[in-house]
Amino acid sequence: MKVAIVGASGAVGQEFLRILAERDFPMDELVLFGSERSAGRKYSFKGKDYEVRLLQHNDDFKDVDIAFVSAGGGTSKEYADTITKHGAVMIDNSSAFRMDDDVPLVVPECNAEDALKRPRGIIANPNCTTIMMVVVLQPL
């Protein structure tokens, strides 16, 4: 499995890397993307260094299976088609798609099955306050 992280140099991108390593997420390949300001930076993941590539409208996502995206709503909207056009599943952490009927809002503890219903190839999450609330309310 090939995994991409968009917004890799930001706080959430770094947290994605930490959690993927901590959980020993099964992947064969990792690719990091960022802005012009971040491109060229190097980050270590499981003992290997990875260089951040410039996010562009091209075919860099052709063989990507999952893209974790946390680069802001504008970037998510602008690059959604670029990321998903070859079949990658985009898991978006921004507010860009929270009102889009074709993008499921998924909180795994509550509605994990909705992640399978993704007509646009995108899964989004609700905002942090909503996530905490639905996790508590779900058993009721």
Ranges and model annotations:
Residues 1-139:
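N-terminal Rossmann-like NAD(P) cofactor-binding subdomain of oxidoreductases
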